[in-house]
């Protein structure tokens, strides 16, 4: 009986493996057979090798072409001609829930229902459109002026070296928190000697532990140690990113009634009838959205600012041409109307920064 059972299991395994490799709807895409067989292939490169999947995908493209299958149901493309077809304005297919997990309260970035995502995105576009951002320029200018004043104080005190990535992340966090709730995190003032404030340390801790937290073997081992009282100490709340993002929502809701009419992101997300088929967010939903916006905005804007300024600073010719164009511009001109700012400079920066990114996965 045991022999028959073993034969049956082996036969079922062979059939299942053959189906995934040769007969599934994804079998038409080229790629390693091991990747087609099991999602552990992706886990190995993304989690165990801590983020090496993107680099490995470029090696796969060199071997298999512009479209590569790197999981049982995952493909990756590096042909720009496919971008508009996949990331079109009105998608005909939804996001894969398995990729985003199963959050109790979805945010815009993690919402897998197409109609709900469209309604939430339409609401947010009213606060992040270019026209609205231009109207909020006084807020941006105020934060810029605050940053210049702190840099002046630090340089006058003899400080010559700064963590420029943290500087840009602090600026982004203060600006984004103000834009979202009307109050600022105060990251630029949190560290008197630089820009290593509590929130910046918290998001850095999240980045540093991201792959460890996704490692199911490490998580189960840690849980087992906790059962016997040998687990790691509780996480310092000041290193928990959620302490700050959820606190921003708590502070906004507690003072909402006394603020009157606002034009913040949280305000429009809690207004009834903002757009058709949109329901005002509850407190847990607003917290989920706040976490998502901060996670998507602070590191991204910080990296973009710091890397862009680096590429400008390393080339004196670019600095000179940019400064000349700004000095000779008139008050009536906008940055978008300056040819070098939006033309040659953008191409110069993007051509260098292409080495920092890989093509988006599907």
Swiss-Prot record:
One of its GO terms (molecular function) is iron ion binding. GO terms for cellular component: membrane. Keywords: Membrane, Transmembrane, Transmembrane helix. Pathway: Secondary metabolite biosynthesis. Gene3D superfamilies: Cytochrome P450. Its main location: membrane. Belongs to the cytochrome P450 family. This is Cytochrome P450 monooxygenase-like protein avaN. It comes from Aspergillus versicolor. The gene is avaN.
